[in-house]
UniProtKB/Swiss-Prot annotation:
Species for this entry: Bordetella parapertussis (strain 12822 / ATCC BAA-587 / NCTC 13253)
Encoding gene (name): kdpA
Family: Belongs to the KdpA family.
Role of this protein: Part of the high-affinity ATP-driven potassium transport (or Kdp) system, which catalyzes the hydrolysis of ATP coupled with the electrogenic transport of potassium into the cytoplasm. This subunit binds the periplasmic potassium ions and delivers the ions to the membrane domain of KdpB through an intramembrane tunnel.
Keyword Transport: yes
Assembly: The system is composed of three essential subunits: KdpA, KdpB and KdpC.
Protein name listed in UniProt: Potassium-transporting ATPase potassium-binding subunit
Length: 594
């Protein structure tokens, strides 16, 4: 770790934490239906959408109706995205003439984008038409993020209300989050990215003649244009030599903006934010990192204002920031170390370079390590370098942040409702230690509440570890591993952790675009998203129905340093210890290998 990284981290956190209160206040006003600076143009459109859908925004729902509405909306989203992918060969805005996507890949991608995961087993520029990118994937980038915000707001209402039976209206929350939060921010960010060189057009791909011949491996396709696999399920490839380079075009900036602001992460291009058309320079890189954590940080402020105590939100934000800074420093330290080859050559510990494998020269080690920490602290998954090329211990940072449940800032909405589950757990543990009935924000924490909290915390580890075991035991799972041994195990563990925790990034050495992995990861994404959401809504309904208790002497304060420390400890101990055996078999074993 050097001065470059420390300066970048300090600049990043300063801008982020200064912007969070301003946006957080705006989100609170928008989600409560109060007047904002966007009301003049947004309210007529909002009312028109309600009339078109036949929705009464004032008709509130209990937690069960809220959950059913959310699930129905998301199931319809999966069907729409699947259909657009399968039919894209016959639809317009397809200048490259790309065929329909294979059924298993289309299903995996549909689940991926609807669940806010954006896991991509395909290369966007060679698989998806412009229409599919815009109408299917970009639309889901908006509404999946809005779903996360809506569920969080429902939980916050459950904490803020007392003796109540309802949590709000899902349709109203969905529309307001999209119209007043996501759309305006995305418009501003898209313009900023275009100013830095991110492409935004509907032009056909450009073919350029190169001076030197290029040789690369490409997937072998069958008569229907779908990837072929061998007898053991391994992908088949062909070697291609060419002097023609195809430069992909497309409406990149508009998708890039919501990909980041909605903590979605799915890139327009296969290289994601390492591609110069998505992330051209250091300024665009800083903007993209800020966009990823802006709304998750702001929602902490929204939470504090909605429950009537800003200090409650600041305490949660402080715990997130402490964890984030520690993981960022860890990633930078291990990536700045010499690679084994450099160490054998007796390179200086802090010599220029460090582990530059898999990193863009225009970003370097510091910006790549920070971006990796940002994208896995959030459930984003966008990358500006190759995580598979991180050192064994450097790769632990993005892996472990996902395994903690994506609560260090976390995804839009999902990060904070996950962290609030840990906050309730921390209060429960404190209550056991001092022999008092646990309370949080004046609500008594009872058996049903702790059952839902336990489900939120344990659902994803169960999916990750069970899925990893299935992949390791199955022939089709092992066939996708291109790097056998400890690192190959890490690649499978990373893929399952990313899918179940709705992150979407990858150790890309795993060949995951096969029927086996498309189905396995699709199931992990679906249940990793909606098991937790339903449990959170049940928790919100339980809390809303409780009377508010007056503050008692000797109660656990939830706004001071002691609570922050207890919350950080709960996240690390309960979240991280679950994965110690798996981490020992993967990155730790790889690090200890000679």
């Amino acid at each position: 770790m050097n001065a470059d990284f420390l300066g970048l981290l300090l600049l990043y956190l300063t801008i982020l934490l200064c912007a969070a209160p301003l946006l957080g206040r705006h989100i609170r006003q928008a989600m409560n239906g109060e007047r904002t600076w966007l009301t003049a143009w947004g309210q007529p459109l909002e009312r028109g959408l309600y009339r078109l859908a036949g929705v009464d925004p004032a008709a509130e729902m209990d937690w069960r109706r809220y959950a059913v509405a959310m699930l129905v909306f998301n199931v319809l989203g999966v069907l729409a995205v699947y259909a657009l992918q399968r039919l894209q060969g016959w639809l317009p805005l397809n200048p490259a003439g790309l065929p329909g996507v294979a059924p298993d890949s289309a299903l995996n991608t549909a689940i991926s984008f609807v669940t806010n995961t954006n896991w991509q087993g395909y290369a966007g520029e060679s698989t998806m038409s412009y229409l599919t990118q815009m109408l299917a994937l970009t639309v889901q980038n908006f509404v999946s993020a809005a779903t996360g915000i809506a569920v969080l707001i429902a939980l916050v209402r459950g904490l803020a209300r007392h003796s109540a039976a309802t949590l709000g209206n899902f349709w109203a929350d969905l529309v307001r989050a999209t119209l007043y939060v996501l759309l305006p921010l995305s418009f501003i960010l898209a313009l900023a990215l275009v100013s830095q060189g991110v492409v935004q057009n509907l032009d056909p791909y450009v073919e350029a003649q190169t001076v030197q011949a290029q040789q690369y491996e490409t997937a072998r396709l069958d008569a229907q244009g779908q990837p072929m696999t061998g007898p053991a399920g391994q992908p088949l490839t062909d070697t291609v030599v060419t002097r023609v380079q195809t430069l992909p075009m497309g409406p990149v900036a508009s998708q890039e903006a919501i990909k980041l602001l909605g903590t979605n992460g799915g890139g327009f291009f296969n290289a994601n934010s390492a591609h110069p058309y998505e992330n051209p320079n250091a300024w665009s890189n800083l903007l993209e990192m800020l966009a990823i954590l802006l709304i998750p940080a702001a929602l902490c402020w929204t939470f504090g204002e909605m429950v009537g105590s800003r200090r409650q939100g600041v305490a949660i934000l402080a715990a997130m920031t402490v964890l984030f800074a520690g993981f960022a420093a860890s990633a930078a330290y291990f990536e700045q170390q010499p690679t084994p080859a450099l160490r054998q050559a007796e390179a200086a510990l802090l010599a220029d370079g460090g582990n530059l494998e898999g990193k863009e020269a225009r970003f370097g080690v510091a910006a790549t390590a920070l971006f990796a920490t940002v994208t896995t602290a959030a459930s984003c998954g966008a990358v500006n370098g190759m995580h598979d090329s991180f050192s064994a211990l450097g790769g632990v940072t993005p892996l472990l942040q996902m395994q903690l449940g994506e609560v260090i800032y976390g995804g839009v909405g999902s990060g904070l409702y996950g962290m609030l589950a840990f906050a309730i757990l921390a209060v429960f543990i404190a209550g056991l230690m001092i022999g008092r009935t646990p309370e949080y924000l004046g609500k008594k924490i009872e058996a049903l509440d702790m059952q839902m909290v336990a489900l939120v915390i344990l659902a994803t580890p169960a999916l990750v570890l069970a899925g990893t075991a299935v992949a390791v035991l199955a022939d089709a799972g092992r066939a996708g591993v291109l790097n056998p041994g400890a690192h190959g195990f890490s690649e499978i563990l990373y893929a399952m952790s990313s899918a179940a925790n709705n992150n979407g990034s990858a150790f890309a050495g795993l060949s995951a675009n096969t029927p086996f992995y498309n189905v396995l990861l699709g199931l992990a994404m679906w249940f990793g998203r909606y098991t937790i959401i339903v449990a959170i809504l049940a928790l919100a309904g339980s809390l809303a129905a409780k009377p508010r208790l007056p503050a008692s002497v000797g109660g656990m304060p939830t706004t001071g340093p002691l609570f922050v420390a207890l919350l950080v400890g709960a996240v690390l101990l309960v979240g991280a210890l679950t994965y110690v055996p798996a981490l020992a078999l993967g990155p730790v074993a790889e690090h200890l290998q000679p």
